[in-house]
């Protein structure tokens, strides 16, 4: 974090975090900020502080026009290591299991099935693909796995359960010509973190102001001033949960 240095913020990691200064805010973002203050919301200078709430600048991971992804922050520094092979455009089919131990993965690249084995296997395919791969490999709820003729290697009913998402709804307005903003400016600068009136969970809601939400339903790149502004409300701490099930083998 190049803006704040305290016990909640790192200072030496490969992913840059920063916030837009008030002088750099778009007019629509500034109007959203000032309206929230007028309606009684607190000012929030640091959304990454776990105790904060209110309206303020969003932490972003772009710097000097470059978004610092994990590919840039981590892989670009490590891709030339002798003990690292990066396989792009590859589809993992399943884990390779020997007894009760994962020994590798079976993946497809250029229509060829390839086995890759190692002493340690780390599965980090996200909240949906990780349980999906486990079930394809025979790890999970037998009632679901057996439907598709996959041998059950390890019965683990919790695989794919308690799936939580952050549903959102957007409301978009057409801006008057004098309120339109530079198309090359950042469309997301300000966020509101708050507790909904009927919730027992603190800060269960996030509302972001965005000038990049398309009114016509499609995203595109244009040199014309942005002519819309939207509020995107996220349910950030949901109570309900869902499941991931296999649909085929």
Regions found by a protein language model. Name each.
Residues 12-18, 126-128, 176-177, 225-229:
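Flexible glycine/proline-enriched surface loops and loop-helix/loop-strand junctions
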Residues 11-13, 88-91, 101-103, 148, ...:
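Residues that flank catalytic or metal-binding motifs in active/ligand-binding sites
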Residues 44, 85-87, 151-155, 208:
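General small-molecule cofactor/ligand-binding pocket signal
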């Amino acid at each position: 974090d190049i803006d704040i240095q305290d016990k909640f913020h790192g200072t030496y990691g490969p992913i840059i975090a920063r916030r837009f200064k008030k002088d750099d805010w778009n007019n629509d973002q500034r109007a959203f900020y000032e309206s929230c203050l007028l309606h009684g919301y607190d000012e929030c200078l640091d959304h990454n502080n776990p105790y904060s709430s209110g309206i303020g600048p969003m932490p972003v991971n772009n710097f000097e026009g470059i978004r610092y992804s994990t590919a840039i922050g981590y892989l670009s520094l490590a891709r030339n290591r002798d003990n690292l092979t990066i396989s792009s455009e590859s589809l993992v089919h399943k884990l390779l299991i020997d007894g009760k131990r994962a020994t590798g993965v079976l993946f497809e690249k250029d229509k060829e099935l390839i086995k890759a084995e190692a002493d340690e296997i780390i599965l980090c395919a996200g909240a949906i693909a990780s349980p999906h791969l486990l079930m394809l490999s025979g790890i999970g709820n037998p009632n679901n796995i057996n439907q598709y003729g996959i041998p059950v290697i390890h019965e683990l009913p919790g695989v794919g359960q308690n799936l939580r998402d952050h549903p959102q709804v957007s409301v978009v307005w057409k801006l008057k010509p004098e309120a339109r903003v530079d198309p090359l400016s950042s469309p997301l600068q300000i966020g509101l973190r708050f507790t909904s009136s009927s919730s027992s969970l603190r800060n269960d809601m996030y509302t972001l102001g965005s000038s990049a939400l398309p009114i016509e339903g499609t995203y595109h790149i244009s040199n014309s001033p942005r002519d819309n502004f939207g509020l995107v409300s996220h349910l950030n701490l949901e109570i309900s949960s869902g499941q991931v099930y296999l649909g085929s083998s």
